[in-house]
């Protein structure tokens, strides 16, 4: 069995502004909110031990907005169980007032043109996030 991602921690400029969005997204897709971190951040966990955390930025560049075209994380994507679930999360994001970068649509340039259906949105720091459904390979 190949290695899988165990956890990801994201640096966030304003935890109070970002936490509600991450809570909406992560609980929608099955994560459970864990305990807060001592630094003010927190994490969400899956039953298999995978987790995603947010931590406050520190240091000289703490106020800098995320730039996905600089060194570091370009975007983060989660797998959806269905197209309907992509649409459901999109509706929740719109009601929340999240920044939608690209609404749910087919993106034939990805996945060899085989049914890649996704919504793209941003967190308050401008980090690009994605929720994507791809049909099982046949």
Predicted regions and their residues:
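Core segments of cupin and vicinal oxygen chelate
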Residues: 9-58
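Short glycine-enriched loop/turn motifs at secondary-structure junctions
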Residues: 2-4, 69-73, 113
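Vicinal oxygen chelate
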Residues: 12-17, 76-117, 122-124
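Short beta->alpha transition motifs characteristic of CBS
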Residues: 113-114, 120, 131-138
